[in-house]
Amino acid sequence: MVLKSLLGIASLFLALNFDAVVHAEANGAIPSIGGRYFHGRVEIPVPAFAQDDPRWSDVRLGPSTDTLGDEGCAVTSAAMVAAFYGIKTDPQQLNAFLTRTGGFTGDGLIHWSRVPSIAPAHLELAYNGGPSYELIDSNLLAGNPVIALIPLPDGGYHFVVIVGKEGRDYLIRDPAASPFRRAYHLRDLTDRIAGLCFFRAI
């Protein structure tokens, strides 16, 4: 998925106001390598989903004219995290649920606060905002994966799931990669982190 504009990114982080997201991207993005040093490789066993899986790649993303295969990185990342917490879902099922329950804007941008409503007794939105090594590292040590908003070299944006760390290198599950690919270094995809979103089990 490539998100084309900062306006689109601001809208994707709907728990924040637009100015806050613009400020975070302009002034608060952090390098993709950093934070606390992890000895060895720490990796949370997050299930892998791919947005271009033929089972759902052609499914329409929410009420938009886009498809999960083209623009479904946020929904696919959320589905990976929800499945990790034991919720029986996948990108197609989560997309259908959010479409039915007002979980998207008209352009197919996700309301992160609506994601836990698929299992309200089990999951809650804990954070949706700017990047922080402390937030990422403390969640990884607690066994919680973190969804990250990242800028891409071509000027687009993408969502991935941070699932671990090796030294100061973050490990990700990438919804645009094959589900059979091992978690790989975030630095191989981007040099910055622009935003974070994570959930917690209740």
Q: How would you label these PLM feature ranges?
A:
Residues 2-103:
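Active-site-adjacent structural segments surrounding the nucleophilic cysteine of cysteine proteases
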Residues 15, 19-25, 45, 79-202:
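Conserved active-site-adjacent core of cysteine acyl-enzyme catalytic domains
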